[in-house]
């Protein structure tokens, strides 16, 4: 008859290694070189944390067990041997029960909403690791392409001289992306404005929202486009003498936010 093989993986969790965060590193993702990343997470009152993801084949491994700083609140781990320029999805596994994305990630993958983002708006969006993870996962990538600014230095108008047009990307252009928004700059400039204030563009819950329900404060919501597309929009605004102001709701955090889930 047919023979089926299976395997079971056990990992015995010991006490975390106590070691100081290397000098010069900040909370979040630290790119050491093209093959190395150090992740730093502020998470007081936790017993142990693993950084689990594509780099560890989504398994608990000694190499992904985070060190605990002597402050008893900051966790860190250095991941080596990474492929240059590859996007790695990952999560934090905390105290044996909680899986969360990195609260300071600059990009996340959403199993519920990413499928509704068009290729035109976000070309080349990597697949969610279905069957390996659940919930939102964060992403790191070494050797990211550098954007060359056409306007490397921009002096915004004085506060008292600002003529601001506030807009919601979702409702202002039918395509709902930065690429199309760039095409409207001549119209906005003809109105006599010298600043555009964008309603929140950081990752919020769902795709269609005013943005005042943020879940990741420094990750751009992919529904409006890529980081490069956003930079092109800002660069184009500056080329037209238009400042860009971001509406940020720092006092809000909703259920998908790791900062909510962790406490």
Whereabouts are the PLM-identified features?
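Proline-enriched interdomain boundary motifs that mark the N-terminal boundary
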Residues: 17-24
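Aromatic-rich carbohydrate-binding modules that target alpha-glucans
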Residues: 33, 40-87, 95-119
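Short, solvent-exposed loop/turn segments at the edges of extracellular beta-sandwich modules
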Residues: 1-3
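Core domains of carbohydrate- and sulfate-ester-processing enzymes
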Residues: 98-151, 260-262
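Substrate-binding/active-site clefts of carbohydrate-active enzymes
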Residues: 108-113, 145-146, 150-162, 168-263
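Intrinsic-disorder/low-complexity, polar/charged segments enriched in Ser/Thr/Lys/Arg/Asp/Glu/Gln
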Residues: 5-7, 36-38, 74-76, 164
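C-terminal edge beta-strand
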Residues: 5-15
């Amino acid at each position: 008859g047919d023979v089926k093989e299976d395997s079971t993986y056990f990992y015995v969790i010991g006490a975390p290694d106590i070691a100081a965060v290397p000098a010069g590193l900040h909370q979040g993702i630290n790119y050491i070189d093209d093959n190395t990343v150090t992740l730093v997470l502020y998470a007081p009152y936790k017993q142990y944390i693993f950084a689990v993801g594509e780099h560890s084949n989504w398994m608990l491994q000694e190499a992904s067990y985070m060190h605990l700083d002597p402050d008893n609140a900051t966790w860190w781990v250095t991941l080596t041997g990474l492929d240059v320029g590859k996007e790695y999805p990952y999560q934090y596994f905390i105290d044996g029960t909680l899986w969360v994305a990195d609260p300071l990630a600059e990009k996340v993958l959403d199993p519920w909403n990413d499928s509704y983002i068009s290729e035109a708006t976000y070309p080349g969006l990597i697949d969610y690791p279905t069957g390996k993870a659940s919930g939102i996962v964060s992403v790191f990538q070494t050797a990211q392409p550098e954007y060359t600014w056409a306007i490397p230095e921009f002096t915004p108008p004085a506060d008292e001289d600002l003529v601001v047009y506030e807009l919601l990307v979702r409702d202002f252009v039918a395509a709902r992306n930065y690429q199309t928004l760039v095409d409207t700059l001549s119209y906005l400039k003809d109105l006599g404005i010298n600043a555009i204030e964008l309603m929140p563009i950081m990752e919020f819950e769902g795709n269609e929202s005013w943005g005042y329900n943020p879940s990741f404060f420094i990750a751009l919501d992919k529904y409006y486009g890529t980081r490069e597309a956003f930079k092109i929009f800002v660069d184009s605004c500056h080329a037209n003498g238009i400042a860009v102001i971001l509406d940020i709701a720092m006092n809000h955090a909703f259920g998908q936010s790791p900062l909510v889930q962790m406490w």
